[in-house]
Protein backbone atom coordinates (compact mmCIF):
# COMPACT_ATOMS: atom_id res chain seq x y z
CA UNK A 1 0.00 0.00 0.00
CA UNK A 2 1.53 3.27 -1.18
CA UNK A 3 0.91 6.70 0.32
CA UNK A 4 2.01 9.68 -1.78
CA UNK A 5 3.09 12.85 0.07
CA UNK A 6 0.34 14.94 -1.53
CA UNK A 7 -2.26 12.37 -0.49
CA UNK A 8 -0.87 12.19 3.03
CA UNK A 9 -1.25 15.94 3.29
CA UNK A 10 -4.82 15.81 1.97
CA UNK A 11 -5.75 12.96 4.33
CA UNK A 12 -4.43 14.78 7.39
CA UNK A 13 -6.12 18.06 6.42
CA UNK A 14 -9.46 16.38 5.69
CA UNK A 15 -9.42 14.44 8.97
CA UNK A 16 -8.38 17.40 11.13
CA UNK A 17 -11.05 19.64 9.58
CA UNK A 18 -13.66 17.05 10.60
CA UNK A 19 -12.57 17.68 14.20
CA UNK A 20 -13.00 21.43 13.83
CA UNK A 21 -9.37 22.35 13.17
CA UNK A 22 -9.18 25.48 10.96
CA UNK A 23 -7.87 24.74 7.46
CA UNK A 24 -4.70 26.81 7.85
CA UNK A 25 -3.81 25.04 11.11
CA UNK A 26 -4.54 21.69 9.49
CA UNK A 27 -2.20 22.56 6.60
CA UNK A 28 0.62 23.50 8.98
CA UNK A 29 0.18 20.25 10.88
CA UNK A 30 0.10 18.21 7.68
CA UNK A 31 3.28 19.89 6.43
CA UNK A 32 5.19 18.73 9.51
CA UNK A 33 3.88 15.16 9.21
CA UNK A 34 4.81 15.00 5.52
CA UNK A 35 8.25 16.47 6.20
CA UNK A 36 8.87 13.71 8.76
CA UNK A 37 7.80 10.94 6.39
CA UNK A 38 9.78 12.30 3.46
CA UNK A 39 12.93 12.54 5.57
CA UNK A 40 12.46 8.99 6.81
CA UNK A 41 11.43 9.87 10.37
CA UNK A 42 8.53 7.44 10.03
CA UNK A 43 8.12 7.21 13.81
CA UNK A 44 6.92 10.84 13.72
CA UNK A 45 5.04 10.70 10.42
CA UNK A 46 1.62 9.35 9.50
CA UNK A 47 2.20 6.42 11.86
CA UNK A 48 1.86 8.84 14.77
CA UNK A 49 -1.34 10.42 13.44
CA UNK A 50 -3.80 8.02 15.16
CA UNK A 51 -2.39 9.20 18.50
CA UNK A 52 -3.46 12.75 17.63
CA UNK A 53 -6.96 11.57 16.75
CA UNK A 54 -7.33 9.87 20.13
CA UNK A 55 -6.21 13.07 21.86
CA UNK A 56 -8.69 15.14 19.83
CA UNK A 57 -11.54 12.77 20.69
CA UNK A 58 -10.71 13.00 24.40
CA UNK A 59 -10.41 16.78 24.37
CA UNK A 60 -6.68 16.71 25.10
CA UNK A 61 -5.97 18.62 21.89
CA UNK A 62 -7.88 21.88 21.50
CA UNK A 63 -8.79 22.21 17.79
CA UNK A 64 -9.28 26.00 18.05
CA UNK A 65 -6.82 27.22 20.68
CA UNK A 66 -6.41 30.80 21.84
CA UNK A 67 -2.62 30.94 21.50
CA UNK A 68 -1.23 33.84 23.55
CA UNK A 69 2.07 35.53 24.24
CA UNK A 70 2.01 35.74 28.04
CA UNK A 71 5.44 37.32 28.59
CA UNK A 72 7.71 39.19 26.19
CA UNK A 73 10.89 41.22 25.80
CA UNK A 74 12.73 42.36 22.65
CA UNK A 75 14.63 39.04 22.49
CA UNK A 76 12.38 36.61 24.38
CA UNK A 77 8.80 35.45 24.74
CA UNK A 78 6.68 32.84 26.46
CA UNK A 79 3.72 31.41 24.54
CA UNK A 80 0.77 29.56 26.07
CA UNK A 81 -0.56 27.16 23.44
CA UNK A 82 -3.97 26.55 25.07
CA UNK A 83 -3.55 22.80 24.38
CA UNK A 84 -3.39 23.41 20.64
CA UNK A 85 -1.70 21.23 18.05
CA UNK A 86 2.04 21.34 18.71
CA UNK A 87 2.83 21.98 15.06
CA UNK A 88 0.73 25.13 15.01
CA UNK A 89 2.15 26.45 18.28
CA UNK A 90 5.68 25.45 17.33
CA UNK A 91 5.64 27.22 13.97
CA UNK A 92 4.22 30.36 15.56
CA UNK A 93 6.94 30.24 18.24
CA UNK A 94 9.85 29.81 15.84
CA UNK A 95 8.50 32.49 13.51
CA UNK A 96 8.40 34.85 16.49
CA UNK A 97 11.98 33.88 17.42
CA UNK A 98 13.09 34.61 13.84
CA UNK A 99 11.36 38.01 13.89
CA UNK A 100 13.13 38.92 17.12
CA UNK A 101 16.49 37.71 15.78
CA UNK A 102 16.08 39.96 12.74
CA UNK A 103 15.65 42.92 15.09
CA UNK A 104 18.08 42.22 17.95
CA UNK A 105 20.27 39.32 16.81
CA UNK A 106 18.69 36.52 18.78
CA UNK A 107 15.18 35.29 19.54
CA UNK A 108 14.36 32.82 22.30
CA UNK A 109 10.74 31.68 22.60
CA UNK A 110 9.47 29.15 25.14
CA UNK A 111 6.11 27.41 24.94
CA UNK A 112 3.85 25.63 27.39
CA UNK A 113 0.45 23.93 27.11
CA UNK A 114 1.15 22.73 23.58
CA UNK A 115 0.91 19.19 22.25
CA UNK A 116 3.41 16.91 20.51
CA UNK A 117 4.93 18.89 17.64
CA UNK A 118 6.36 16.16 15.40
CA UNK A 119 9.99 16.41 14.33
CA UNK A 120 12.08 19.12 15.99
CA UNK A 121 14.14 19.70 12.86
CA UNK A 122 11.18 21.18 10.99
CA UNK A 123 11.30 24.27 13.22
CA UNK A 124 15.09 24.68 13.23
CA UNK A 125 15.01 24.60 9.44
CA UNK A 126 12.50 27.47 9.43
CA UNK A 127 15.28 29.60 10.92
CA UNK A 128 17.93 28.05 8.66
CA UNK A 129 15.87 29.00 5.61
CA UNK A 130 16.02 32.62 6.80
CA UNK A 131 19.86 32.42 6.88
CA UNK A 132 19.86 32.00 10.64
CA UNK A 133 20.90 29.32 13.08
CA UNK A 134 17.87 27.46 14.41
CA UNK A 135 17.80 25.44 17.62
CA UNK A 136 14.78 23.51 18.89
CA UNK A 137 14.54 21.45 22.06
CA UNK A 138 11.67 19.77 23.89
CA UNK A 139 11.09 17.47 26.82
CA UNK A 140 8.83 14.43 26.67
CA UNK A 141 7.06 12.24 29.18
CA UNK A 142 9.44 9.96 31.12
CA UNK A 143 10.99 7.17 29.08
CA UNK A 144 14.64 7.20 30.09
CA UNK A 145 16.46 6.42 33.32
CA UNK A 146 19.35 8.56 34.53
CA UNK A 147 22.72 6.93 33.88
CA UNK A 148 23.12 4.06 36.34
CA UNK A 149 19.41 3.97 37.21
CA UNK A 150 16.42 1.89 36.15
CA UNK A 151 13.53 4.27 36.89
CA UNK A 152 11.98 6.42 34.16
CA UNK A 153 12.44 10.10 35.00
CA UNK A 154 13.65 11.86 31.84
CA UNK A 155 12.12 12.07 28.39
CA UNK A 156 13.87 11.16 25.15
CA UNK A 157 14.38 14.94 24.92
CA UNK A 158 15.35 15.72 21.31
CA UNK A 159 17.49 18.57 20.08
CA UNK A 160 17.63 19.96 16.54
CA UNK A 161 20.17 22.44 15.18
CA UNK A 162 20.18 23.77 11.62
CA UNK A 163 22.21 26.28 9.61
CA UNK A 164 23.50 26.57 6.05
CA UNK A 165 26.15 28.00 3.79
CA UNK A 166 25.83 28.69 0.08
CA UNK A 167 26.80 25.12 -0.85
CA UNK A 168 25.94 22.99 2.16
CA UNK A 169 23.37 22.79 4.89
CA UNK A 170 23.64 21.21 8.32
CA UNK A 171 20.48 19.84 9.96
CA UNK A 172 20.89 17.74 13.08
CA UNK A 173 17.73 16.23 14.59
CA UNK A 174 18.27 13.65 17.31
CA UNK A 175 16.90 12.28 20.55
CA UNK A 176 19.20 12.18 23.56
CA UNK A 177 18.03 8.63 24.15
CA UNK A 178 19.70 5.77 22.27
CA UNK A 179 16.40 5.33 20.40
CA UNK A 180 13.37 7.58 20.02
CA UNK A 181 10.24 6.36 21.79
CA UNK A 182 8.38 6.80 18.51
CA UNK A 183 10.62 4.17 16.94
CA UNK A 184 9.74 1.74 19.74
CA UNK A 185 6.03 2.43 19.22
CA UNK A 186 6.54 1.87 15.51
CA UNK A 187 8.34 -1.44 16.19
CA UNK A 188 5.46 -2.50 18.43
CA UNK A 189 2.94 -1.73 15.69
CA UNK A 190 5.00 -3.58 13.08
CA UNK A 191 5.69 -6.46 15.51
CA UNK A 192 9.45 -6.26 15.07
CA UNK A 193 12.34 -6.08 17.55
CA UNK A 194 14.29 -2.97 18.45
CA UNK A 195 18.12 -2.89 18.21
CA UNK A 196 20.19 -4.32 21.05
CA UNK A 197 21.59 -1.93 23.63
CA UNK A 198 18.76 0.61 23.40
CA UNK A 199 16.51 -0.34 26.30
CA UNK A 200 16.05 -2.39 29.46
CA UNK A 201 12.93 -4.08 30.83
CA UNK A 202 11.27 -3.19 34.14
CA UNK A 203 13.88 -5.28 35.98
CA UNK A 204 16.76 -3.42 34.38
CA UNK A 205 17.69 -6.25 32.01
CA UNK A 206 18.57 -5.56 28.35
CA UNK A 207 15.68 -6.19 25.94
CA UNK A 208 14.88 -6.01 22.23
CA UNK A 209 11.14 -6.49 22.84
CA UNK A 210 9.40 -3.12 22.21
CA UNK A 211 6.60 -3.90 24.69
CA UNK A 212 9.11 -4.68 27.46
CA UNK A 213 11.12 -1.59 26.52
CA UNK A 214 8.05 0.60 26.99
CA UNK A 215 7.42 -1.00 30.39
CA UNK A 216 11.06 -0.51 31.30
CA UNK A 217 13.43 2.28 30.27
CA UNK A 218 15.17 3.58 27.19
CA UNK A 219 18.91 4.08 27.71
CA UNK A 220 20.64 7.42 27.06
CA UNK A 221 22.99 7.53 24.09
CA UNK A 222 26.66 7.68 25.06
CA UNK A 223 26.00 6.72 28.69
CA UNK A 224 26.60 9.64 31.08
CA UNK A 225 27.08 12.12 28.21
CA UNK A 226 23.63 11.54 26.75
CA UNK A 227 22.15 11.54 30.23
CA UNK A 228 23.74 14.90 31.00
CA UNK A 229 22.48 16.44 27.77
CA UNK A 230 18.98 15.02 28.30
CA UNK A 231 18.91 16.46 31.82
CA UNK A 232 19.92 19.91 30.56
CA UNK A 233 17.28 19.81 27.80
CA UNK A 234 14.66 18.70 30.35
CA UNK A 235 15.15 21.89 32.35
CA UNK A 236 15.70 24.31 29.47
CA UNK A 237 12.56 23.08 27.70
CA UNK A 238 10.49 23.98 30.75
CA UNK A 239 11.82 27.53 31.10
CA UNK A 240 8.45 28.92 29.98
CA UNK A 241 6.64 27.31 32.91
CA UNK A 242 6.10 23.75 31.66
CA UNK A 243 6.57 20.63 33.77
CA UNK A 244 9.72 18.55 34.26
CA UNK A 245 10.57 14.96 35.16
CA UNK A 246 7.76 12.63 36.15
CA UNK A 247 5.20 15.46 35.91
CA UNK A 248 5.60 15.59 32.12
CA UNK A 249 2.68 13.80 30.46
CA UNK A 250 0.83 13.47 27.18
CA UNK A 251 3.59 13.28 24.56
CA UNK A 252 3.20 9.52 24.06
CA UNK A 253 -0.03 8.77 25.90
CA UNK A 254 -2.88 10.62 24.16
CA UNK A 255 -5.20 9.88 27.08
CA UNK A 256 -3.33 12.42 29.21
CA UNK A 257 -3.11 16.18 28.79
CA UNK A 258 0.24 17.35 27.49
CA UNK A 259 2.38 19.19 30.05
CA UNK A 260 5.77 19.33 28.29
CA UNK A 261 7.61 22.46 27.17
CA UNK A 262 9.52 23.56 24.08
CA UNK A 263 12.26 26.09 23.44
CA UNK A 264 12.84 27.70 20.04
CA UNK A 265 16.00 29.72 19.38
CA UNK A 266 16.98 31.75 16.32
CA UNK A 267 20.45 33.32 16.06
CA UNK A 268 21.17 35.90 13.38
CA UNK A 269 24.81 35.68 12.16
CA UNK A 270 24.52 39.21 10.76
CA UNK A 271 24.87 40.49 14.34
CA UNK A 272 28.11 38.50 14.81
CA UNK A 273 30.59 37.82 11.98
CA UNK A 274 28.08 38.76 9.31
CA UNK A 275 25.73 36.54 7.32
CA UNK A 276 27.92 36.07 4.25
CA UNK A 277 31.08 35.40 6.24
CA UNK A 278 29.22 32.84 8.34
CA UNK A 279 27.98 31.06 5.22
CA UNK A 280 31.49 31.10 3.78
CA UNK A 281 32.87 29.46 6.91
CA UNK A 282 30.08 26.86 6.94
CA UNK A 283 31.03 25.86 3.40
CA UNK A 284 34.73 25.92 4.23
CA UNK A 285 34.28 23.57 7.19
CA UNK A 286 31.85 21.21 5.51
CA UNK A 287 34.04 21.08 2.40
CA UNK A 288 36.88 20.00 4.66
CA UNK A 289 34.65 17.35 6.24
CA UNK A 290 33.35 16.00 2.92
CA UNK A 291 36.81 15.94 1.32
CA UNK A 292 38.49 14.18 4.23
CA UNK A 293 39.52 10.56 3.77
CA UNK A 294 36.85 8.08 4.90
CA UNK A 295 37.57 4.89 6.80
CA UNK A 296 37.24 1.70 4.80
CA UNK A 297 33.59 0.88 4.11
CA UNK A 298 32.31 4.30 5.21
CA UNK A 299 31.02 7.45 3.57
CA UNK A 300 31.41 10.72 5.42
CA UNK A 301 28.03 12.40 5.76
CA UNK A 302 26.84 15.73 7.10
CA UNK A 303 23.87 15.71 9.49
CA UNK A 304 20.77 16.05 7.35
CA UNK A 305 22.33 14.54 4.23
CA UNK A 306 20.62 11.17 4.64
CA UNK A 307 17.29 12.94 5.11
CA UNK A 308 17.79 14.88 1.86
CA UNK A 309 18.44 11.63 0.03
CA UNK A 310 15.37 10.09 1.62
CA UNK A 311 13.26 13.00 0.38
CA UNK A 312 14.32 12.24 -3.18
CA UNK A 313 13.64 8.52 -2.77
CA UNK A 314 10.25 8.97 -1.10
CA UNK A 315 8.85 11.95 -3.06
CA UNK A 316 6.71 9.68 -5.25
CA UNK A 317 5.29 7.75 -2.30
CA UNK A 318 6.20 5.24 0.38
CA UNK A 319 4.78 2.04 1.78
CA UNK A 320 2.69 1.86 4.92
CA UNK A 321 2.15 -1.34 6.89
CA UNK A 322 -1.19 -3.14 7.17
CA UNK A 323 -1.74 -2.26 10.84
CA UNK A 324 -1.37 1.45 10.11
CA UNK A 325 -3.60 1.16 7.05
CA UNK A 326 -6.32 -0.43 9.20
CA UNK A 327 -6.00 2.31 11.82
CA UNK A 328 -6.33 5.03 9.18
CA UNK A 329 -9.22 3.20 7.53
CA UNK A 330 -11.08 3.06 10.85
CA UNK A 331 -10.54 6.80 11.38
CA UNK A 332 -11.81 7.55 7.87
CA UNK A 333 -14.86 5.31 8.28
CA UNK A 334 -15.84 7.07 11.51
CA UNK A 335 -15.65 10.45 9.76
CA UNK A 336 -17.39 9.50 6.52
CA UNK A 337 -14.19 9.55 4.46
CA UNK A 338 -12.98 6.86 2.05
CA UNK A 339 -9.44 5.63 2.73
CA UNK A 340 -9.15 4.54 -0.92
CA UNK A 341 -9.22 8.21 -1.92
CA UNK A 342 -5.83 8.64 -0.25
CA UNK A 343 -3.92 5.35 -0.35
CA UNK A 344 -3.14 3.36 -3.48
Curated annotation (Swiss-Prot):
The lineage of its organism: Archaea, Methanobacteriati, Methanobacteriota, Methanomada group, Methanococci. Its EC number is 1.1.1.337. Its main location: cytoplasm. GO terms for molecular function: L-2-hydroxycarboxylate dehydrogenase (NAD+) activity; sulfopyruvate decarboxylase activity. It catalyses: a (2S)-2-hydroxycarboxylate + NAD(+) = a 2-oxocarboxylate + NADH + H(+). Belongs to the LDH2/MDH2 oxidoreductase family. Catalyzes the reduction of sulfopyruvate to (R)-sulfolactate much more efficiently than the reverse reaction. Also catalyzes the reduction of oxaloacetate, alpha-ketoglutarate, and to a much lower extent, KHTCA, but not pyruvate. Involved in the biosynthesis of both coenzyme M (with (R)-sulfolactate) and methanopterin (with alpha-ketoglutarate). InterPro entries: LDH2/MDH2_Oxidoreductase, Mal/L-sulf/L-lact_DH-like_ah, Mal/L-sulf/L-lact_DH-like_NADP, Mal/L-sulfo/L-lacto_DH-like_sf, Malate/L-lactate_DH-like. Keywords: Coenzyme M biosynthesis, Cytoplasm, NAD, Oxidoreductase. It is found in: Cytoplasm. Pathway: Cofactor biosynthesis; coenzyme M biosynthesis; sulfoacetaldehyde from phosphoenolpyruvate and sulfite: step 3/4; Cofactor biosynthesis; 5,6,7,8-tetrahydromethanopterin biosynthesis. The keyword Phosphoprotein does not apply. It comes from the Archaea. One of its GO terms (cellular component) is cytoplasm. One of its GO terms (biological process) is coenzyme M biosynthetic process. This is L-sulfolactate dehydrogenase.
